[in-house]
Amino acid sequence: MYPSVDIIIPYYKRRDLLERSLDSLEQTIYPAMSIIVVDNGGTEAGLVFLVKRYRNARLVRLPENRGYAGGCNEGLKNSSADYVVFMNDDTEHDPLWLEHLVRAALDDDRIGALQPKILSLNPYKKGKKIFDYAGAAGGMIDRLGYPWCLGRTFSGVETDNGQYDRGQDIFWASGVAMFVKKSVAEELGGFDEDFFMHMEEIDLSWRMKLAGYRVRSVPSSVVFHEGGASLPGGSPEKIYYNHRNNVTMLLKNRSAAALLWLLPLRLLLDIAASVFYLTQFPGGIKKSGAVFRALAFNIRGFSAIMKKRRTVQSSRVVDERTIFRHVPISLFYRR
């Protein structure tokens, strides 16, 4: 008996990407897989007919764009599977990608989330195995709250030479292809929809770890991703969501003692980042302003964030020292 798996794909106005991804998923070798496409506020009449072309695929339509987080949560509500995979619509897949993930999940009852190896799609088509920026071989974080990945630091990505081909515990699983035990996602309330997009998977992974679940990489499972196809890297909107959601995530999940030293330092670092963005052309003023917009969001929403924090901290079963035992102080000085 194979555990059932629903692939949940939030979709927003890129039919060419979705069609390519669904074509690839059709080649997946797994007998108990279904697909849920969540249309985030779109009005494309042809989307219904597109989804009907694929076996075991169905469409859920939302009246408004609720972002990646909201689309995934709606898919979760419509799923009755044992496991779900939250997946970007600009992906392609090795035929055995899902079987490897299911096997890894069945080996350990404490698994909350798993991440496949994520390679960059376009270089792969040219014969180059390069890790994808958005997840690579597994998500990590430093003690200042800056995320990085095995196989990627800052904007630099490594060639996949098998250096991360042993599965290991990671800090977060990428939302490009995030395999999750459905009961765990429901227990934790799914994604925080106030994130809208960017870093919501880090927040959910962090809450899983606080609740005592494991997050691991499964490098035998391979997914290919066309990074930046939905929102270009370096855009003011991407800068805004990354800075905004990173601070929200810290406020929710870090200990009170850590926040006493971390928040003043992060304020200084964000101001420094805004000055750096001013030197960029074109669009430096908008990029710099995005940092202050992010800061303003967290100030205005501080009370609501603290309410979420109380919920997270009241249910945690793993202490701060255990969570950060192998986490570097800064990715500048990681060993």
Language-model region placement:
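A conserved acidic beta->alpha catalytic loop
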Residues: 24, 39-48, 64, 94
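Short beta-strand/loop segment that forms part of the nucleotide-sugar
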Residues: 32-41, 60-62
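Glycine-rich, basic loop-to-helix element that forms the pyrophosphate-binding segment
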Residues: 62-79, 89, 100
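Active-site-adjacent helix/loop segment of glycosyltransferases
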Residues: 211-307, 315, 321, 326
